[in-house]
Amino acid sequence: MLYQQIARNKRKTILVMFGFFVLLALIGAAIGYLFARTVIGGMIIAAIIAVIYMSVIIGQSTDVVMRMNNATEVRSASDAPELWHIVEDMALVARVPMPKVYIIHDPSPNAFATGNDPEHAAVAATTGLMEKMNREELEGVMAHEMTHVRNYDIRLQTIALALASAIAMLVNFAGNFWWIGGRSSSDDRDNPSSIFAILGSILLIILAPLAATIAQMALSRNREYLADAGAVELTRNPQGMISALEKLKTAVPMKHVDPSSSALYISDPEKNAKHHPFSNLFDTHPPLDKRIERLRQM
């Protein structure tokens, strides 16, 4: 089961990369058509920019994500002994290398894992998590994060985060260039086919970040159920994980969190209350009640 899930996540990584690159190509085509009337040229430029951006953020994913979330590295066990030793124990049980450990100074209990692979992983916990959770609950949370590391979820989410950010950057560039002076000529506005092409390009640029966000959120929701079950497998203590999730239900939003990193956390750090019919498409996590229910059925 474990190795099947790892293989499945690797296949998902390939599919996610392919899907995002298709989206990037379409955005490049739209930008190229709008501003230079060259679809191929726009696609090539977008691909080059995206590859450079992805190489930087993926190559430095841990440092980038930790800076975005104001996390401070724990250099030795003496700086945070309980957290350090729990992470060390859970890494040993999960049979992965000891990850780097970080602390986020925020009263809201939360945690996340990031990195490219188990050899370059890192976990972060808020001061609120360390203060509000007892040892069994903290073990459950860290086991959850170690499951993400072991199953290569961290690579999948890092790639999704990098590509979604690259898409947002390209769309932001297109919007700024449009207002500065990249609008179409009067000849284009008089040509019906050009008008439709322009409108289609604008619509694609507007909807692309939405599509990227929905894909990223779906990946995040799916991986949480598996990590909860993995935490129970590692600790042999379902009640510890259930109790931790119960406490997360009553947590307040984090004070300082980067929205693009929300999907990485064990629980939605922004605690957004959405009640419209399509809210589930944009949820970064499954409802905590459903996660608890699944654990109780194990």
Swiss-Prot record:
InterPro entries: HtpX_protease (IPR050083), Pept_M48_protease_HtpX (IPR022919), Peptidase_M48 (IPR001915). Its cofactor is Zn(2+). Its EC number is 3.4.24.-. The gene is htpX. The active site is at 145. Zn(2+) binds at residues 144, 148, 224. Belongs to the peptidase M48B family. This is Protease HtpX homolog. It is an enzyme of class 3 (hydrolase). It is a multi-pass membrane protein. One of its GO terms (molecular function) is metalloendopeptidase activity. The chain crosses the membrane at residues 14-34, 39-59, 159-179, 195-215. GO terms for cellular component: plasma membrane. It comes from Limosilactobacillus reuteri (strain DSM 20016) (Lactobacillus reuteri). It is found in: Cell membrane.
